[in-house]
């Protein structure tokens, strides 16, 4: 099956980057940032000349999705987005640290790619300094963001004992691979230290700058509109989207009150919502006694949905999802990468049982694991979109959030977890737009968010600065989920009707697509989108 197309062949040939999406690595990320100007020139030639002859090109007419991507990327805002998007939350150092801090990744092919191209790590400080020190972007940042750079540029290495414990390689190979690990680690640490010096130097400029409003607001509304479309693959009325977010939040609060009273008789209908959240969070039945109990709980839920979706409903399974338990204070709580669902237990005492079903449905089956492996095994029809751009986030993360509502035989506590996660994604819409489009401050948004979430205050602050540094991305979950709801009509969902699941399977095979084309394909009336 053809896993590529003309445009991807041109780009990978000229930029000398990996063409197999399974082998994309941080090295390709570095090459992409470094060669951005060359990339734009390639797209420009491809855009204006249907007969563009290239050594790797088989001359075919461009399709509508390719045209949309190329025209969108050639807008001047895309270059600004590359520079501002390479920040403390999203940068090559973080990508490398994920590999070097995780013993499970050292035997993966991407580690070999990193070792082979290890000298390219020396280019990261120059590339990153250029991105964050542009004088026109000074007000995009504040001292807090620069300090957060320093907090993530760190290097807690793993030991040979930790690696040996999980490796499937022979003893001799383990010794050889770990020698390579030490070589890469030394280069990585040296460059982290060099970049930290640059950050500290630049941070001094913010000492006397009391910049409370950060983000796109300083650059302009047109730029934020571009960022939002870059993650959704569709242009929406931002003020309508914000209004809908507030309406959805009220609906979810009302629903949470109903289910909270079902699980705790001491909760009353007129109780302050923050007190309800405290009672739910501190309910002893939802706490774990040990990491072992937590691990078994997750494994059982993964097994449950594997039996339902793979064995009973005949969803495709190309690989079984692996649950990888690890502990690292600098990495996120849970995420999926190719075949692995990584679960960070660093803060396990604050993790709750009622969130497990939603997280498993989102990250594994029928969520990201099912969607990604279906995509890889059936051939990505528009691989260049998946490879270089965020424009598929609406589809991919929307499918993940939509999957959270596809549970079976759930308890009231499971429903509470689903409501909490949907409320969380709804708040993202409100906060992201308020920060970047209406000039609200992170402090204002913190005071707003904390009244609706079970997470601790430091995690909420981390979330807000994530939105500052990656405008539009956080909106993609809820908007994408709404598209799938409109297609499948979740309000009339019948869990025993196999036709519903046949449509789910078809949607996975159709994608991933920018939401604009998914909406057109299924004839969704955009005027009724926010109802």
Language-model segment annotations:
Residues 1-531:
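N-terminal maturation segment of proteins
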